[in-house]
Swiss-Prot record:
This is 2,3-bisphosphoglycerate-dependent phosphoglycerate mutase. NCBIfam families: pgm_1, PRK01112.1. The active site is at residues 9, 111. Gene3D superfamilies: Phosphoglycerate mutase-like. The keyword Isomerase applies. SUPFAM superfamilies: Phosphoglycerate mutase-like. CDD domains: HP_PGM_like. It comes from the Bacteria. Keywords: Gluconeogenesis, Glycolysis, Isomerase. The record marks 181 as: Transition state stabilizer. It comes from Chlamydia pneumoniae. GO terms for molecular function: phosphoglycerate mutase activity. The gene is gpmA.
């Protein structure tokens, strides 16, 4: 059996201001920092062998802060994709390498790209375009905001990345911690739980609250201790 821990990043500065963030690289707010520490305490006794985050700083901050509480005391280190950076950051101490946890970053796990809504206030946007249209942009499965992505579009990048990079880790018995975003995680959970296009629309993931699945009997299922 292996664990899959999914965590939406803590509150960002733009979450706090009720702005659309998308791919804009916004850090955590003070509350978000506290949420990351709290999430870390919730998973501190769970085994973790590798970490995956998006390329956005709020995702990375959440993972790093959460891991400060981990019982293993192991240090996350970023595994660079660029060959030169990977070689330049090589660890030559086997002892220290054993005390570290690899962390992989990919834009495939980034938040849904909100296009022309990015940086705009959510309430004011609803007043400008109408609540129904904005609700359609935000909550429908295949309708995207101007120049942005729908949840369907987001899934076209998150799911292939999951199947190529994360699923094999679980199949090899590795425990995986994924720190990402509301919509990138919703798109994955849609597949994990076999949710319909209608069912996924009501799926809400609060900031800083981990959800745990397990790889068991050749399939991913909800962990009974965390889903009750």
């Amino acid at each position: 059996m292996a664990l899959l821990i999914l965590l939406r990043h803590g509150q960002s500065v733009w979450n706090e201001k009720n702005l659309f963030s998308g791919w804009v690289d916004i850090p955590l707010s003070q509350q978000g920092i506290e949420e990351a520490f709290s999430a870390g305490r919730a998973i501190q006794n769970l085994p973790i062998d590798c970490i995956f985050t998006s390329t956005l700083v709020r995702s990375l901050m959440t993972a790093l802060l959460a891991m400060t509480n981990h019982h293993s005391k192991k240090i996350p280190y970023i595994v660079h994709e660029d060959p030169k950076a990977k070689e330049m950051s090589r660890i030559y101490s086997a002892e220290e390498e054993n005390n570290m946890i690899p962390l992989y970053q990919s834009s495939a796990l980034n938040e849904r790209m909100y296009g022309e809504l990015q940086g705009k206030n959510k309430k004011q946007t609803a007043e400008q375009f109408g609540e129904e249209r904005v609700k359609l942009w935000r909550r429908s499965y295949k309708t995207a905001p101007p120049q942005g992505e729908s949840l369907y579009d987001t899934k076209q990048r998150t799911l292939p990345y999951f199947e190529k990079n994360i699923l094999p880790q679980l199949q090899n018995g590795k425990n995986v911690f994924v720190s990402a975003h509301g919509n990138s995680l919703r798109s994955l959970i849609m597949d994990l739980e076999k949710l319909s296009e209608e069912e996924v629309l009501s799926l809400e993931l609060p900031t800083g609250k981990p959800v745990v699945y397990q790889w068991k009997n050749h399939k991913i299922e909800k962990h009974p201790e965390f889903f009750g």
